[in-house]
Amino acid sequence: MEAAIIDAAMDREREGDRQVSVELVERAVRGDRGAFERLVEPHLLVAMGAARLITGDEADAADAVQDALLTSWQALDGLRDPQLFRAWFRKIVIRSATKFVRGRRRLVELDLDAAGPIDSVEREFDRRQLTRAFARLDPKDRVLLTLHHYWQMPVAESAQLLGLPEGTVRSRVHHALKRLRACYDAEVRR
């Protein structure tokens, strides 16, 4: 069920990208809060989900998204290309969530509903193990896996967002997945 909600939110976010206009960004830069709300609204649910994955806490995620909203409102005049609003906003969300992680290391809740039709008991067992495994990862690994798997961001876009070469991002995602698998295997053996 939650996976369907996330899919719908991501579809809405993509639709929001198509609706971004230079005029809307310009109005927001001039202080039009309504225009800013129209810019960010399609992205909020997905941003909240990503922030929750990174911070591991609903309250911290909400604070991180709120911080990202404030930062993006204040820095909107620095957005060079209105069509890149989604990537620009995502970068701010990732930075904000990462900032919260540095101060608070907590257990991360992952949604495994997308894993398929697994028996609910097995799903809950897997969820707990994966949650503990994900929480054991370094925050940088969490960010990479969130970008790559949760947001399904192409490597080129992730590289641009993180300011890294594409090959480095590919390599780091690969190694982050290996570390997640190792942590998960350790949880299964417990």
Where are the model-predicted features located?
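Internal acidic/polar
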Residues: 4-9, 14-21, 99, 105-133, ...
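Arg/Lys-rich amphipathic alpha helix in sigma70-family domain 2
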Residues: 74-81, 91-111, 123-126, 175, ...
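Residue-level preference for hydrophobic side chains embedded in well-ordered alpha helices
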Residues: 39, 43, 47, 68, ...
